Amino acid sequence: MKGIGDPWGYAEPSVKRIHRKLFRLTDKIAALEVELCQVTAELEYHRSINDDAQRDAAVGNYIDREEAGATSADVRRFEKTISDLNGRIEKLSGKRDRLLASIPE
């Protein structure tokens, strides 16, 4: 039921609930995007270290090859984290889009 000073129906409990969910989803998406930005920057750092380690391993001894394996594993771990974060962001964005479509007009 619309209130006297509420021409858009925001007093409806279902609309309030949808709006609260939308705000929470938007906050979660924003936090994940910040985390994604940080992880991407770290990945670039680890890729640089990995490039150096791979070059050292090509001309170095067994210790250099072990370090190259470790840095390569770090790069793969960060790439997986980025992939997971992108998947979570896409999932939450889809959920947000469905909620936006369900808002009564």
Where are these regions (language model features)?
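Short, charge-rich amphipathic alpha-helices with coiled-coil/heptad character
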Residues: 1-28, 103-105
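A short linear-motif detector with a strong N-terminal bias
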Residues: 9-10, 35-37
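Generic structural concept
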Residues: 19-22, 26, 47, 68, ...
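General structural signal for alpha-helix termini and helix-helix connectors
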Residues: 24, 31, 56-59, 77
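Amphipathic alpha-helical coiled-coil segments
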Residues: 29-36, 74-99
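Extended alpha-helical coiled-coil "stalk/arm" regions
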Residues: 36-60, 64
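Short, glycine/alanine-rich amphipathic alpha-helical segment
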Residues: 59-81
